[in-house]
Amino acid sequence: MVLGAVLILATAGGVAWRRRDGRMRESPVPRLTEGDLGQPLGTRATLLQVSSAFCAPCRATRQLLSDVAGRSDGVAHVEIDVTTRMDLARRLDIRRTPTVLVLGPRGQVTRRASGLPRRADVVAALAVATGEAAP
C-alpha cells in the first residue's frame, strides 16, 4: 500500500517536472545591461543562455538559440558560463543549466525557461519581448 502511494507520488512529481521543463514563463528579474553581460544587447531582443561546460542540453540549446537569433533581425544570442559568472547566476536565481532568459530591447527580462526550450516557445517569447504579440 505504501509502495503504491510512493510510486503514484513519484510519477505525479515526474510528470509535473517534465511539463515545466523547458517551458517559457514570466520572470520578475529587472533589467540587465551590456555591462552585466559583458556583451552588447540586441537592438530588438536578446536571448541570454546560462550554461555550464559539462551540460549536454546546453549544446542543443546553443544551436537552437543561435539559429533563432540568426533568422531574426536585431536579436542577439549571448551565452555565459555559470562557473565564471556566479555573481550573475545568483542575481538571476539560476538553479540549473541551461537556463534561457529572453530580454527586451532595453534589457528587461520578459521570459525565462530552465532546460532545453522548444523552438516555438522561443519564437513566441521573442514576439512578446519585441512587442509583436500580446503577453
Regions found by a protein language model. Give the residues of each.
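Typically the conserved alpha-helix immediately C-terminal to a functionally engaged Cys/Sec
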Residues: 59-71
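Non-catalytic, surface beta->alpha helical segment in thiol-disulfide oxidoreductase systems
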Residues: 102-135
